């Protein structure tokens, strides 16, 4: 018979699973993710398949060359949303360091981020993600091609209602459960939506953007996750990338993240191991240093060449001019 504490833990996991439409999986308490939910819908997967075919064909001229080489500059807004007791948590220096890390992480893709502004707000409800829709309706700036990042000081798991709604929308997020209560969400972000076009009303993309726990910014108090890596990971989703362990299977039928040069991976990485091979019968070790894994910040280092190319192609296909 399980000890009482173990029974409580098992019941908690069962309860969480009953509220998730998508896969929920338990990991170590100090890992980047307790419950990975949601995922790309059929239309988004089809776009990845189309771009995979596009990228594998020979270049057809000057347009392809420009698409491959032209620098991409993304207008960006940072919104610092704090509770009253955390009003001074995010300093100007942390904002500067986060932006610097963002520029460095994406420079090999020739993608840069032009910070249009930083807004600061003290709102207990928004700081804990109590009303995501109202917050974004009030704070969001720019069109669909504008990146909005919401750094919230007490970002919490969504309510059961919001949880079901978000997963049905196909958003990507990951939750973090420390040994401190209550559990916090490190971040979540929207994938590009193939249905959005230049004439789409603002209401159709009002939730677009990335929510990031402010404590993960450079210099924040989240040990092993305070170098700014969460924002890099989430913005990778905004740029169209999936997790390196997408599908969580070694099966040949699993398309994974639709990126040819990321090795097959069946489980997220926890922390920063010396190496890991979750699919030993497939070529290559798990890319534990990839920004789209769940490794700790001290392990994060890079995107692959094909990930860099895919983000550029996603920009031209899904966000530019919208």
Curated annotation (Swiss-Prot):
Alphabetized GO MF terms: metal ion binding; metallopeptidase activity
Which UniProt keywords are given for this protein, alphabetically ordered?
Disulfide bond, Glycoprotein, Hydrolase, Metal-binding, Metalloprotease, Protease, Secreted, Signal, Virulence, Zinc
Q: Where is the signal peptide?
A: 1-22
Root EC class: hydrolase
Which residues act catalytically here?
234
**Principal location:** secreted
The record's listing under Pfam families reads: Peptidase_M43
Q: Which residues are glycosylated?
A: 123, 197
The enzyme's E.C. designation:
3.4.24.-
GO CC, any one term: extracellular region
Q: Which residues form a coiled coil?
A: none
CDD domains associated with the record? ZnMc_pappalysin_like
Disulfide bond positions: 272-299
Q: Which SUPFAM superfamilies match?
A: Metalloproteases ('zincins'), catalytic domain
A GO biological-process term: proteolysis
Q: Where found in the cell?
A: Secreted
Q: Which InterPro entries match?
A: MetalloPept_cat_dom_sf (IPR024079), Peptidase_M43 (IPR008754)
Q: Which residues bind Zn(2+)?
A: 233, 237
User: So what family is this one in?
Assistant: Belongs to the peptidase M43B family.
Family matches, as PANTHER family: METALLOPROTEASE MEP1 (AFU_ORTHOLOGUE AFUA_1G07730)-RELATED, PTHR47466
Protein purpose: Secreted metalloproteinase that allows assimilation of proteinaceous substrates. Plays a pivotal role as a pathogenicity determinant during infections and contributes to the ability of the pathogen to persist within the mammalian host.
What's this protein's name? Extracellular metalloprotease AFUB_008060
